[in-house]
């Protein structure tokens, strides 16, 4: 086969082991998955009720425009419906963005470490990837990113809060950054974890009307608890949305996914409860980290913590796994002596912390 040259050296995504597989291997009767930043509280009771009572005509294609969901989300954020695009998770939106803006003559700027799919999709398109190391505290080096932009740059990625460090860039700094980015360079502000930030930042969706080169990406996979439904969306100027729709598959979000997302966004009381529970979980880890001088906890603003114990990441990962907790080894994330742990329920956090204390 005459494969694209840009695929040379790239590897496919390797999912972690299934919980059942890990239990069988280690002889465990229970395992808790804290590796994929899923919502430990599940999803809204309204979503659960819809799931229990919904019947979907599986032989009928879904609404390719996601009309009902589009109206609800537009009303929620006070946007025009044409300022939205819906995709099969933010993963698909990242793919569409790289497809319309990157090729072998272009480059893209991002932090490192950050969400790996920016880099992967850029390389698939054959583009040059310019990675700017995070600052010592895990924050984006925004000045360094600005300096990396040239005439061939078409996309700049800002993951906020950043995955895997959890650092959050406040709105004033985002605006100052946007003021300096050339108007023909798209800034992707990936806010997959924005609903977890405490206290919540002021509404800023209106920025797309000031900065015509901005797209804000969000998802129903995290705090809304719909990871398997695969519904993400982008907020941007209509001209950007029009270009993305050219390459968007016509029926890319499912009927049930659209319906579940509508119920999910309506239940903001559940979202507030999730945000409070998550903030309390972060405090548990902060209290733990303060007791041990060798422990470094990166600023946590998502639903996970990146914690450096000064111990080889694989050792930490295997130790927690053998004790019934699947986490994410920092070795694959650019942090060789750290692990990323999803914030769980209070008792789950306490159990993991107790195990880490024993390891230290």
Curated annotation (Swiss-Prot):
GO biological process, one term: L-histidine biosynthetic process
Disulphide connectivity of cysteines: none
Classification via InterPro entries: Aminotransferase_I/II_large (IPR004839), HisP_aminotrans (IPR005861), HistidinolP_aminotransfase (IPR050106), PyrdxlP-dep_Trfase (IPR015424), PyrdxlP-dep_Trfase_major (IPR015421), PyrdxlP-dep_Trfase_small (IPR015422)
Highest taxon in the source lineage: Bacteria
Name of a matching Pfam family: Aminotran_1_2
The protein's annotated pathway: Amino-acid biosynthesis; L-histidine biosynthesis; L-histidine from 5-phospho-alpha-D-ribose 1-diphosphate: step 7/9
Keyword Transcription: no
Enzyme's top EC category: transferase
Catalytic activity: L-histidinol phosphate + 2-oxoglutarate = 3-(imidazol-4-yl)-2-oxopropyl phosphate + L-glutamate
Entry EC number(s): 2.6.1.9
N6-(pyridoxal phosphate)lysine PTM sites in chain numbering: 222
Keywords from the UniProt entry: Amino-acid biosynthesis, Aminotransferase, Histidine biosynthesis, Pyridoxal phosphate, Transferase
GO molecular function: histidinol-phosphate transaminase activity; pyridoxal phosphate binding
CDD domains: AAT_like
Cofactor(s) of this protein: pyridoxal 5'-phosphate
PANTHER family: HISTIDINOL-PHOSPHATE AMINOTRANSFERASE (PTHR43643:SF3), HISTIDINOL-PHOSPHATE AMINOTRANSFERASE 2 (PTHR43643)
Family: Belongs to the class-II pyridoxal-phosphate-dependent aminotransferase family. Histidinol-phosphate aminotransferase subfamily.
Subunit structure: Homodimer.
Protein name, UniProt field: Histidinol-phosphate aminotransferase
Organism from which the protein derives: Listeria monocytogenes serotype 4a (strain HCC23)
Taxonomic lineage of the native organism: Bacteria, Bacillati, Bacillota, Bacilli, Bacillales
Gene name of the encoded protein: hisC
